[in-house]
Amino acid sequence: MAEKTLRVQQIGSPIRREASQRQTLIGLKLNKLHRIAELPDTPSVRGMIAKVHHLVRVLDDAA
């Protein structure tokens, strides 16, 4: 069975944000506005998305 994935797009700038939020975006493979990353649907990835929810948009959510 195929592993579930999430597509996440960066919609906010990390400029003037806490260093931990900038590092979280890097961990999500996002480094420029409007970039899209396809990530595995795991609790750790969902936690990272929740931490920077104001900077990213989930494009399709399988769950």
From Swiss-Prot:
CDD domains per record = Ribosomal_L30
Q: Which residues cross the membrane?
A: none
Keywords, alphabetical: Ribonucleoprotein, Ribosomal protein
**Recorded superkingdom:** Bacteria
User: Does this UniProt record's set of keywords contain Glycoprotein?
Assistant: no
What molecular function does GO assign, one term?
Answer: structural constituent of ribosome
- Do the record's keywords include Heme? no
The GO annotation for biological process reads: translation
Can you list the GO cellular component terms from the UniProt entry? cytosolic large ribosomal subunit
Q: How does it assemble?
A: Part of the 50S ribosomal subunit.
Tell me the protein family, please: Belongs to the universal ribosomal protein uL30 family.
Q: What is this protein called?
A: Large ribosomal subunit protein uL30
Q: Which organism is it from?
A: Methylobacterium nodulans (strain LMG 21967 / CNCM I-2342 / ORS 2060)
The organism's lineage?
Answer: Bacteria, Pseudomonadati, Pseudomonadota, Alphaproteobacteria, Hyphomicrobiales
Gene name of the encoded protein: rpmD
